[in-house]
């Protein structure tokens, strides 16, 4: 479950920036994503996408099924099919977005949020879990 601080900050952010928010994902759509990608969605990510859809939060792109217009037409399924070959154990990771340089950001099976730099072939830990990742994004100025 998303922590209270993160949830309150997200609600306030999307009240000020409604165009950055996508359309919430349904239970059936969550099941379809899990089946299509053969992964179990992280609980915090699932709650996020079921509340806010695919969004832009500050400078972070977080994909879902129904994305903000800023993210275009690609869904989280499309994103994972496009980028999973870049990652070791790519099929067991859930790619949730990219940075400004096209590097995939993903949730690992251990729930850690990571980024893969395709130019240097390096992995970097961004946060211990999805809620922490959101909190770091929301605290950026």
Locations of regions flagged by a protein language model:
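Metal-dependent nuclease catalytic cores in nucleic-acid-processing enzymes
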Residues: 136-139
